[in-house]
Amino acid sequence: MATSILGEEPRFGTTPLAMLAATCNKIGNTSPLTTLPESSAFAKGGFHPWKRSSSSCNLGSSLSGFAVATGGRGSGGLAGGSGAANSAFCLASTSPTSSAFSSDYGGLFSNSAAAAAAAAGVSPQEAGGQSAFISKVHTTAADGLYPRVGMAHPYESWYKSGFHSTLAAGEVTNGAASSWWDVHSSPGSWLEVQNPAGGLQSSLHSGAPQASLHSQLGTYNPDFSSLTHSAFSSTGLGSSAAAASHLLSTSQHLLAQDGFKPVLPSYSDSSAAVAAAAASAMISGAAAAAAGGSSARSARRYSGRATCDCPNCQEAERLGPAGASLRRKGLHSCHIPGCGKVYGKTSHLKAHLRWHTGERPFVCNWLFCGKRFTRSDELQRHLRTHTGEKRFACPVCNKRFMRSDHLSKHIKTHNGGGGGKKGSDSDTDASNLETPRSESPDLILHDSGVSAARAAAAAAAAAAAAAAAASAGGKEAASGPNDS
């Protein structure tokens, strides 16, 4: 049958490229009989879109009803034809919304329909009339069967069905259907949106759907239209806003399209400027306070001494750089008139001042004792009387004592009353030697006088003992020869 229809001998090869070239050569031919390459291999297993097969769609009944609804030819002319005349390629011959598609492929599908009709026994005139009738069918009815044929953009069906279901396909222009969701070429700022009165006017091209879209989406007016680039430039965020403009322009337009109202409040340039000024003042004040605090702390930390109110320290502060010698000596004197005690550490001076004031902050917590002391070493010495601890041992005889002065007196006995370690009235050990004594000056003088008297008495006794020993030795030497 194919040989009878195609009245041309096979001149091309059987490769797909050769068949494609032959098909392209035949496009635009108005003859009802189209010559296509044919060979034994092509007739057996090749792909031929215009060749009738047993599995081709038979849409006679649907086409008959379709013709009646659109006012075309009678249903008998279409229903009486074979299934090849009603193939799917005849329906999609042309489309009013796609002129390029119609001009390029309209003749191809018309010729193929005429060839199939001739093969089925239908006259070429009737087949041509059928193709002409089908090409004049309005696209809105054909879109129900083949919605993707003749679309100007892949999102056109969603665009028409989502916003206005009554829009015809011919009313939607290519510019209006393909530009409203695109990213703007030059957005002003990352929060710059359309004016409240226009809605989507700047994001839609001029076309028929604008009136209906404005009527539907005009109520969704953005509340942050006054938040422009100047508000952020006053606060020093202009560069970051400009850098983020190309990232957020699409999302904010889609936010307005979907009907979500923004949550950002409106700000004016004056309020933003006031807030920026307040923030800068607060930051500068905090920085100045931090700098002042750090300088004061560093001055106290690296001054080499703690804060002291003794007369020597006050004099050094008054003299300034001239008082460096006083600060270098590190002498802290008691300010009580008539005392004149001088200490090398402020802690010793504070302990001494507690003796003047009578303050006794250290309390013995032994059962039924409750005695109070001026210094902590005094309390420790008192606690050893309760516990019986003897922490001072003699290095010669290993005898132990409770007080350090007792040990000092004992060591003198080993040295024959002279030299050796000089004892102190304090019972502090080597770890607490820096703690000053808190006895009164009278007691200290009394102790020193007693010690001197004892030393003098001991020296006199030693001299007397030596004289007695010398006299006894002389007598023995004088009587020795007489005894013999």
Curated annotation (Swiss-Prot):
It comes from the Eukaryota. This is Transcription factor Sp9. Transcription factor which plays a key role in limb development. Positively regulates FGF8 expression in the apical ectodermal ridge (AER) and contributes to limb outgrowth in embryos. GO terms for biological process: embryonic limb morphogenesis; regulation of transcription by RNA polymerase II. PROSITE patterns: ZINC_FINGER_C2H2_1, ZINC_FINGER_C2H2_2. A zinc finger (C2H2-type) spans 332-356, 362-386, 392-414. A motif (9aaTAD) lies at residues 178-186. It is found in: Nucleus. Keywords: DNA-binding, Metal-binding, Nucleus, Phosphoprotein, Repeat, Transcription, Transcription regulation, Zinc, Zinc-finger. The modification Phosphoserine is found at S440. Its main location: nucleus. InterPro entries: Znf_C2H2_sf, Znf_C2H2_type. GO terms for molecular function: DNA-binding transcription factor activity, RNA polymerase II-specific; RNA polymerase II cis-regulatory region sequence-specific DNA binding; sequence-specific double-stranded DNA binding; zinc ion binding. It comes from Homo sapiens. Pfam families: zf-C2H2. Residues 409-446 are annotated as: Disordered.
